[in-house]
Amino acid sequence: MTYIDFYFNVENKLNKIHEILEKEIFRKRKIFIAVNDLNGAEALSNFLYTASITSFLPHMIGHHEEKAPIHIGWDYKSVSDDFMINLKSDISPSFSRYLRLIEIVSNNEEDKKTARDRLKFYRDRGYEIQLIDASKEI
């Protein structure tokens, strides 16, 4: 069964993604990040290249069979079933194939509303969900 984490009250989604990726890469995870479109993928890729001068997060845009542990895409096609970070407002039709799904929710009211809809969808289907208040993390 897919384990789902909802990070809410996130001030900066990009920083939270970077934080999560650094932990999960260390654990040898294969990660798919779902974004809205190519522009979103390129913006995230650029951020990952410049976010830290002390670490590098190997990634690529698209779903090629390359060995990069992080793939960024917008069509929900992934080369791995290990781990997904959903940055889209809709629900992936294939979310249940992943061992773990992370939803990141900002303080934006529209983002909160669509996140509540996704949360209800997952709960109604019996998924175990962990709610993590990012404003209380150290």
Task: State what each model feature region is.
Residues 100, 105-111, 115:
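Trafficking entry modules
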Residues 1-13:
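Glycine-rich phosphate-binding "P-loop"
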Residues 17-63:
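Short, well-structured hydrophobic secondary-structure segments
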Residues 63-102:
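Mid-chain, well-packed structural core segment of small domains
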